[in-house]
Structure formats: structure tokens, C-alpha cells
Amino acid sequence: MNFLQTLNISATNKGVSTGVQWVKSKGEKLSSYSPVDGVLIGTVLGADKEAYEVVITKAQEAFADWRLWPAPKRGEIVRLVGMELRKFKTELGTLVSYEMGKSLQEGMGEVQEMIDICDFAVGLSRQLHGSTMHSERPGHRMYDQYHPLGIVGIISAFNFPVAVWAWNSMLAWVCGDVTVWKPSEKTPLCAVACQQIIQTVFKKNNVPEGVCGLISGGRDVGEWMSADKRIPLVSATGSTRMGKAVGAVVGERLGRSLLELGGNNSIIISSEADINIAITAAVFGAVGTAGQRCTTTRRLIIHEKIYNKFKERLVNAYSPLKIGNPLNEKMHVGPLIDKDAVTNYLNAVEKCKEEGGNFIVEPGVLKGKAFESGCYVKPCVAEAKNSYEIVQHETFAPILYIMKYKTIDEAIAMQNGVPQGLSSSIITNNLREAEQFLSHAGSDCGIANVNIGTSGAEIGGAFGGEKETGGGRESGSDAWKVYMRRQTNTINYTDKLPLAQGIRFDL
């Protein structure tokens, strides 16, 4: 496969790097099998503790130098990274699709997200601003400013094997931080490919060795990072269970954690909805990336007046979906990441049936020619209740639950009535409904949309959610502040020393 050669991916690959050179290691060997066809793409040698220490030590040394570079100069490096990513967009996007299983256009879109966040970060490098405040004391000035934090540990998930790392890294770098990346063991080759691209830019521009570390491996690497006091911030994307474990360990040492965890996202379909928009938003939201996005639409809350009509339209919309090799751009749905994910899908289907769910679009595992990997499943739709245990749980698969509501208050209560709080949406032409949904009494999610679906976030906005989603924010807006330490400054430019609150202390 030519795209692998272009990305310098071979049958066996080193998986530990300081950002400038590869590090010898004797850790776990990670084998990457494509869910597309079941073929072994390549292996990656993970980190042992010695290799881990090499990367962390280099990161510490690099931070001492990198933080002194002017922020716009750091931004220039990120700009060059973005230019290099543009050169390899097709090849890297193809690898994302082949190793993870998402459609080719989604793979290309993920690399475009990387490029977009580079562009955003370049502008940000000239806007890392604080605030100036008036002091109550005469002849004094107050302001706050932001300083680089240190090493940022990034633990990423398989479903977005490169974009989420870029969200964190590009912002961290312009903020003056250095990064250490532990990619998902299910998609290690995407990380190796990114590192190859980054190394080229960093070597040409004399970026300190250690600014961009890679530490491939299994759970033990994530545990080392979480417990490491030399890493002041750990950004972790994954399941709620994983996030709770990371958050507890990081919190025990009073470090910072940025957690991007599960979602159980819903679309409210109003009686005044544009049905065409609603159908497209619902179907793409539910089946895109084979239901493996954090923002995948998992629930439709449909007004009772249009429930039967909408249900019929929804079933008809599912009928022409093409399932198959995601490198074929005619396909709508690719495979799940692995056979464990297929097992989870089947278990969720059975659980839904046991609780009383009625499947109006039938589930199943596809077999035969072109489905040899065993990872292809049918997107399905079930009538269910919000109270079902399985509905309260996030299943990373294309399973969509639909249910009725009578009033907007009831719909919002159903939307909020799950442990997770990532993304939400309402499809309506009623201004009052839309504004209520967006108000303090509306959606309790970190993302709340009107007349678009729950997935497909742009990098300009902060991305993240509440409750068991973790509370972290990545990407745009002012998410950069989590990567820096805040400092308040008071300057006295007189020959006197008045105290605040009118206190006197005479000597």
C-alpha cells in the first residue's frame, strides 16, 4: 500500500520518540489489524519504563528552553506543522480510515481538523492575553497573565486517532508547553505516522528535543503518566471508567486533568421541526463513524404528534445505507474497531430486547465476502424508554433509541436524564423552544445545538461536556487557558506602601 510507504510505516515500527529521534524500548509489542479487512498492517514496539524515563527527561529539559521562545515564534513552528500536514493529508487520512475503520471522507476530515487547529493556534500565539484591573490603592496597577505550565500528557482514544492529539498539542505548544502522547493501542500506526511528519519539521527548525514526545504502549503507560508528578496536566479521552481512574490518580497528587469522556447524546425532534433536516441530522449522527464518535446521536426524543410519521421516514432513510469498505467513498458505514466492539454491540441489542425494546430497523453482524474482518454490523433503531438501563449506558456502536414526548419541558428532562452530558440538539422552527433549550433551564450538556445534529463540532468552539463526560474543554474559544498557569500581579509605582482593605501598619 503506497500510502504506508509515503508515511514511512513499515512492518515493524518503533513507538517511542523524543520528537527528534526514536528511542529503543523493550515494551509491549502492539499489533495493528485493520478492521476493514482483518489484515495485519504493522506492529509498534511500546515503551518500557526505561524508555519512558528517557522521553520524560527530555521533555523536562526541552520545557526549560521552549517556554522562553516568544509565543509567535512557537506559533510559526505550528504553522509549519500545518503546512506539512497539508502535504500528507491524503495519505494520513487514508491511514486513519484503514486503521480505525471510519469512512475515507471522515478520515480526510479528521486530518483537516488537525490543519484547522494549527491555523487556529497560529493566531492564538499572538493573543495569549490577560486582563488589567484597577487597584483600590493609589499608585498601584493590577493585572493577570498566563505562563507555560510544563509537560502536558495526552492520552487519546481510537475513534479520533490523530485529531484529539492535535487539539491538545497545537494549543499546548503555542502556550509554551511540551507534550507527551500515549495513543490508543488500537491505532498506534496513526501516531507513528504523525510523529514522522512532526520530526521533519522540528529537525529543520531546531526545535528542542523533547517538545513532542511519543510513548506508545498499553494501560501501564497511561498509569505511569497519571501518577507522574512531573506532568502537571493530563488530558485523557476515553470511557467514563477510564476517566474516573485517571482523574483519581492525578487528583491524588493535586495535578490537573482534562477529561473528555462518554456521551449519550440526543436530538429533540419538535412538532415544528423541518423533517428533512431532522432525518439527515439523525441518520448521520447515529451511523457516522459506525456510531463510534463521542458525539454520536444515541437517542431521538420525538414529539408524539409526529412520532409515527417520523418513524416511517427514519426507517426508509436507513434502507439505502451502504455498509462496506470505508475506503470506497460510496459506502456510508464502515466497520467497528474490533471484534470486542462487535460483542458489545450484540450485548446491547440483547439487553435492549430484554428490557422491552422494539427494533424497527433490525440489528445484525454482516458475514461473507467483503466482511471477512468480522467487524461489520448493521446500524439499527429501537423504540425504547429513557429509563432503560441500556439506554442510560453509552454503547460505542450504531444503535439508535427513539422515544416520545408531549411537552418541551418533558423533552428537556429526558434529554438531561442520563449520567453523561456531552452533546445535544433540538430541531425546531419554534424560537421559544429553541431559546428554552439553550437557556439555563435547558440542556445540561457542554454542547447544545439548534437545527443541526449532535456531531461534527468545529474547532473554533470549546469542545467538552458535563457530568460523567468529565467537564474538560479542548480545542477553540478560551480552552487554551487550561494549558497555562495563571498569575496575578500587583505593581506599586510610588514611594509609599498602602495596604489593601484600609489596613494600617505603622513602624
Model-derived segments and spans:
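Residue-level signal for inorganic ion chemistry
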Residues: 38, 74, 96, 118, ...
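Rossmann-like NAD(P) dinucleotide-binding subdomain of oxidoreductase/dehydrogenase enzymes
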Residues: 130-277, 405
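Residues at or immediately preceding the N-termini of alpha-helices
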Residues: 35, 49-52, 71, 89, ...
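A structural signal for short, well-ordered beta-strand elements
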Residues: 31, 45, 67-68, 100, ...
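ALDH superfamily catalytic-core signature
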Residues: 200, 241-386, 413, 450, ...
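Glycine-rich loop-to-alpha-helix module at the N-terminal edge of alpha/beta enzyme cores
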Residues: 39-128, 139
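Conserved C-terminal structural/oligomerization subdomain of aldehyde/semialdehyde dehydrogenase
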Residues: 37-43, 206-207, 231, 268, ...
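Hydrophobic face of amphipathic alpha-helices that form TPR/SEL1-like repeat modules
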Residues: 1-37, 364
